[in-house]
């Protein structure tokens, strides 16, 4: 038989519950609020694969520096750091003061590859302060901070850089490039290919590197007569020079041909196009001054004629000659070049003419290298090395 609840009966039950609640002691509160004991293992959400992790209990913080008490010898830490790449080394340096001081040692920063990176000017100067010797900044973008940092003050510390590749780098302000060059007075190799405008002040800073051997200025702009004279008058130990497609004026071309250092072994003077100053007389000056030349690139110098080949043949050490697209030279004159290892004449003769040259100039190799490698930082299979100096970590 169903039981029927009346309104009076319901009010009686509510009153009874209130009396029970009021009779509850504080100890009962703590018992009721206590959560049931759970297993120290719990299941983590995820796919069908069951994974169980141990619950991590909170630990009281401690101010003890277990690694800073000398438990690990410093010599051991130096050995460990020598196996780390730059990214892991920076992570290690952020853990404690001791590791930060160890990670700043110059032996871990002898080379660095920042290819294609976006980096601030202050960060770059901080990296240079770690006594980097080989630095690759190819295709990097160097920005200026909105709020100028410490480097706005005069930078007095000279850099230890010996090899610097800034090809195709983008600078938010030309003064950034000038600040970098002002710190570099011990360079052995420098590349400013496609870096935009190179003014007279930058040329003066480049000229301070008297031990410069590799200099790549291909496709740079705004060279003045004063700037090029400053560089060539001071850097007399140059072995490889690339000034191809630099849009030099006629006066600058004449001065360059007169002031080239006799120590040159590889020279690229291509891309003058129809400049009348790049003629047979200036080729004669180059051959008379730079008698140790082993490779010469005169591509796209359309004013020179076959008469310049008489002077080129006097270079006893010449092994590679490139005169691609030099349309002013009579192709029959090519047959007089008998002592070359490589002869590049792209665009000068037909395919049948190439076959004739290969048969008549044997064992000279014809049209082997369409692109010049003179003073170029990365050449061949070493895509991350610059001038045969490694810039990449082992992993």
Give residue ranges: language-model regions:
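N-terminal adaptor-interaction module of cullin-RING ubiquitin ligase components
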Residues: 1-155, 161-162, 178, 203
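C-terminal capping region of solenoid repeat domains
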Residues: 1-54, 63, 76, 251-395
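Leucine-rich repeat
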Residues: 64-68, 74-77, 94-100, 104-108, 118-126, 128-134, 155-163, 182-189, ...
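Flexible interhelical turns and helix-capping residues at alpha-helix boundaries
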Residues: 85-88, 188-191, 347
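Concave beta-strand-loop units of leucine-rich repeat
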Residues: 114-116, 137-141, 166-170, 192-196, ...
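Long hydrophobic alpha-helices with heptad-repeat/coiled-coil character
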Residues: 155-186, 260, 272-273, 379-383
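Solenoidal tandem-repeat scaffolds enriched in leucines and small polar residues
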Residues: 184, 188-285
